[in-house]
C-alpha cells in the first residue's frame, strides 16, 4: 500500500513527492506552499474592509425572534442557512439561504453559506430572564478570510481573493443586530447541557432538519447520547419548529409587504420584456430560451435572481407541468405557457401566463 505524507494544508503527497490523483483537482486552492509565496499573496494589498450598514430587515427581526422564543421556551433552536451545492468540479451553484434562516436573520440574497442561527435559552436567574426574555439569539458564522490570513488565497469558499470582501462576525452583527460567534464554536454550543433530565435541568434541542443534513446528523447523534433516544419523537419535535416558522411567515410585516411589491413590479417588467422579445423569437431554433433569457435578465437587474427556474413552454410542451428545459421552438398560432417570478432578497412572486402566440399575417 502506498504511503502518504500530509502537508500543513491537509493534502497528502506520495513518498516520491507527487500528489494523489484525487487531490489534483484542488490544486488551485492548495498550492504552492512556500513562505515567499504566502508573503507575496498576503502583503501590500489596499484596504479590503467591506462597506457595512444595518439591513432594512434588521428592524423587524426582534419581533420575529420574540414570537419564536415564546413558542419554545427553555429549548435550544438550531436554524441553519445551508451549505453550498457543487455544480461541477470546484464550482458551486449560486447560494440561496434556507427560507427559515432568511426570515429570522434578515439575510437573504447569497448570505451566508454555512452560517447557523441558534436560539439559546436563558437561565431563570439571568439578566435576560429578568428583562422578560426566554432566549438570546446567536449567529454562528465563518470569520473573514482577508489578506491577513493564508485562507485569503487558499479557500475558494471564503477566501476574499476568490470571492471578494465578505461579511464576517463584526459585519454580520452590524447588518442583522444579532450577536455573532465563530462557527468553530458551534458544536460545543449546541451540545451544552443537553439532557432529558426529569428534574428539568436539561435542555431539548430542535433543528430545522432538511437544510443541512450533516449538521442534523450531528444533532441527532448528540441527542441520542444525551437521552433523547426516541427518533420519531425527535423528528416530530423538529417538524413542529419548521411548522411554526412556516406559519409565522403567512402574516407579513411591513418590510415583507414592501419587498413583495418590489418583486411584483420586477416580475411585471420581466413579462413586458418577454412579450417585447416574442415577435423576433417566433420560429427561431432556440426561441423558448430567447424568451427565458429576456425574463432572467430582468430578474438579475431588478432583483436578486429568479424565484425558480423560468418555464417557457410552447406547443406540445405547454401541457407539461414543469417544463424547464426550454429547448423548443415558439411557433405562430400555438399555446405559449410562461411561469416565472423575480426574487428580491428572499421573497418572490409567481405569475402564470397562458396565451396563444400571434398568427402569421
PLM features: residue spans?
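Short, Lys/Arg- and Gly-enriched loop/turn segments at beta-strand edges
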Residues: 87-89, 344-351
Amino acid at each position: 500500500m502506498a504511503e502518504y505524507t500530509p502537508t500543513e494544508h491537509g493534502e497528502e503527497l506520495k513518498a516520491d513527492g507527487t500528489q494523489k490523483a484525487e487531490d489534483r483537482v484542488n490544486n488551485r486552492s492548495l498550492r504552492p506552499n512556500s513562505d515567499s509565496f504566502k508573503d507575496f499573496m498576503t502583503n501590500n494589498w489596499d484596504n479590503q474592509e467591506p462597506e457595512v450598514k444595518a439591513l432594512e430587515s434588521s428592524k423587524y427581526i426582534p419581533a420575529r425572534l420574540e414570537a419564536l422564543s415564546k413558542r419554545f421556551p427553555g429549548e435550544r433552536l438550531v436554524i441553519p442557512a445551508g451549505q453550498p451545492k457543487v455544480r461541477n468540479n470546484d464550482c458551486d451553484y449560486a447560494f440561496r439561504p434556507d427560507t427559515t434562516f432568511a426570515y429570522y436573520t434578515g439575510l437573504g440574497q447569497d448570505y451566508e453559506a454555512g452560517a447557523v442561527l441558534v436560539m439559546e435559552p436563558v437561565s431563570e436567574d439571568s439578566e435576560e430572564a429578568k428583562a422578560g426574555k426566554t432566549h438570546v439569539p446567536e449567529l454562528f458564522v465563518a470569520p473573514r478570510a482577508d489578506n491577513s490570513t493564508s485562507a485569503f488565497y487558499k479557500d475558494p469558499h471564503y477566501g476574499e481573493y476568490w470571492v471578494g470582501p465578505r461579511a464576517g462576525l463584526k459585519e454580520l452583527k452590524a447588518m442583522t443586530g444579532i450577536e455573532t460567534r465563530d462557527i468553530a464554536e458551534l458544536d460545543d454550543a449546541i451540545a451544552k447541557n443537553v439532557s432529558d433530565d426529569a428534574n428539568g435541568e436539561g435542555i431539548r434541542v430542535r433543528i430545522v432538519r432538511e437544510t443541512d443534513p450533516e449538521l442534523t446528523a450531528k444533532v441527532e447523534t448528540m441527542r441520542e447520547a444525551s437521552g433523547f433516544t426516541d427518533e420519531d419523537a425527535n423528528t416530530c419535535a423538529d417538524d413542529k419548529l419548521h411548522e411554526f416558522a412556516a406559519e409565522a411567515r403567512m402574516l407579513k410585516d411591513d418590510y415583507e409587504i414592501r419587498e413583495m411589491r418590489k418583486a411584483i413590479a420586477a416580475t411585471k417588467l420581466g413579462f413586458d420584456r418577454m412579450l417585447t422579445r416574442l415577435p423576433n423569437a417566433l420560429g427561431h431554433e432556440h426561441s423558448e430560451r430567447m424568451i427565458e433569457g429576456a425574463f432572467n435578465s430582468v430578474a438579475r437587474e431588478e432583483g436578486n435572481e429568479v424565484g425558480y427556474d423560468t418555464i417557457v413552454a410552447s406547443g406540445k410542451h405547454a401541457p407539461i407541468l414543469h417544463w424547464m428545459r426550454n429547448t423548443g421552438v415558439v411557433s405562430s398560432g400555438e399555446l405559449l405557457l410562461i411561469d416565472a417570478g423575480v426574487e428580491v432578497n428572499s421573497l418572490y412572486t409567481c405569475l402564470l401566463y397562458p396565451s396563444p402566440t400571434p398568427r402569421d399575417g
